[in-house]
A protein has these predicted regions:
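Outer-membrane beta-barrel pore domains
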Residues: 54, 164, 168-170, 179-362
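Conserved, well-structured beta-alpha core segment at the onset of a catalytic domain
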Residues: 130-140, 144-149, 153, 233, ...
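Surface-exposed strand-loop-strand hairpins of Gram-negative outer-membrane beta-barrel proteins
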Residues: 1-13, 136-139, 335, 341
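Outer membrane beta-barrel
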Residues: 6-131, 145-147, 154-162, 256, ...
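Residues that define the transmembrane beta-barrel architecture of outer-membrane proteins
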Residues: 5-15, 45-49, 100-104, 143-149, ...
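Outer-membrane pore/translocation modules
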Residues: 1, 77-78, 83-91, 99, ...
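Sequence/structural signature of outer-membrane beta-barrel proteins
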Residues: 34-40, 72, 90-92, 126-136, ...
């Protein structure tokens, strides 16, 4: 958890540039580069979040090829564009749990009109990587999503947007050599003559989640923005048979415009599906084995996300292209539920975060 009274400019600061070029009415080129705080070791190309060609064979069909945003959430198209939403940041309970910003591949969308409603069906296929800190140390883990595919259905009418997403991917975690050395020591215990020890070692490796696995993702979202009222709600479910990433998360938000000001509130919740991991007693094997069991159990439990968040704030649109926001977040973090915070911790906490941002476009 953050130390008391820490002030930083890094958490929500970012600078982005977009470029669009219309080759002809059927072909468009687009790119977006976002500079923001990233984990050490991040490659420069990770800052390139768009780099694609969009082809429109008809007014109803669009095909994009290249690097695009994974259209998995309500805010996928503009999650880095602060002036586009009322809060200081999107719900951390849902969006921080799935920090996937880019996908390399292709998507095809088809749009049609039905009376006053506009529908769109999009399918996608590609791959993407995202970085995270290891639950057991300061080592990083790169989650590689391969053969990712899915479909999104949206409906817009009179200021209301409804959407549903269903997708899947093959996922593998890649980390430092020291992490794999620990895994090899754990695997050696899976052939221990004591069947209890062997089973405990297999369970620890499964819950550690370093091996290739299938990830399933489902999302439902709804938003309304008309006249003086804005509200939204979103639910996401991630199912992975190994590791601690299986979870469900949701948020609801309500806002009211009063002249140039918008006041809002948001409630969020994130729940890991993995039960608390008990520490095996391997003291009879060796001190090294017990240390390994303790460290892995601590890291697995420390990467579980079980928290609730209440956010209250206001936004002042003092210029057509600028907005000043102030937001207070209060978190209820359960024991062994701090997976959305930096560094593993098994303790419960109720931190507060006060944020102020100036969002602008030019």
């Amino acid at each position: 958890y953050p130390s008391d009274h820490v002030t930083t400019l890094e958490t929500d600061s970012r600078f982005g540039l977009q470029a669009h070029y219309e080759v002809n009415p059927q072909l468009e080129l687009a790119s977006q580069v976002v500079h923001k705080r990233r984990l050490p070791g991040s490659k420069p190309f990770e800052s390139v979040e768009w780099l694609y060609a969009a082809f429109k064979p008809t007014d109803a069909v669009m095909v994009r090829v290249g690097r695009t945003n994974p259209d998995l959430f309500l805010l996928s198209d503009y999650r880095n564009v602060g002036v586009a939403y009322p809060w200081v940041r999107p719900s951390t309970d849902l969006y921080a749990a799935l920090p996937l910003y880019t996908m390399d591949g292709t998507d095809v969308s088809y749009a049609w009109q039905q009376q006053d409603a506009r529908w769109r069906l999009k399918t996608f296929l590609g791959s993407g990587d995202t970085r995270a800190t290891s639950a057991t140390s300061r080592e990083q883990v790169i989650f590689q999503l391969r053969s990712a595919g899915g479909a999104i259905l949206t409906r817009e009418q009179d200021g209301m947007l409804m959407r549903a997403t269903l997708g899947g991917a093959r996922m593998k975690a890649e980390s430092a050599a020291s992490v794999y050395a620990a895994r090899d020591r754990l695997r050696s215990l899976q052939s221990h003559p004591d069947p209890t020890v062997a089973q405990q070692a297999r369970e620890l490796e499964k819950n550690w989640g370093l091996e290739t696995d299938t990830a399933l993702f489902a999302e439902l979202g709804i938003s309304y923005d008309r006249d003086d009222w804005i509200w939204s709600a979103e639910y996401a479910l991630v199912r992975i048979s190994s590791g601690t990433r299986s979870a469900q998360s949701a948020y609801v938000s309500l806002g009211r415009r009063i002249g140039d000001f918008t006041v809002y509130g948001m409630l969020g919740r994130s729940l890991s599906k993995l039960p608390v991991q008990n520490t095996p007693d391997w003291t009879g094997i060796s001190s090294d084995a017990q240390t390994l069991a303790t460290q892995l159990t601590y890291g697995i439990n420390g990467s579980r996300a079980r928290q609730s968040t209440l956010s209250l704030g206001t936004r002042w649109d003092f210029h057509p292209q600028m907005a000043l926001k102030v937001q207070l977040d209060h978190f209820w973090v359960s024991p062994t539920g701090s997976g959305l915070w930096v560094g593993p911790s098994l303790s419960a906490a109720r931190p507060n975060v006060l944020s102020a941002t100036l969002d602008f476009t030019f």
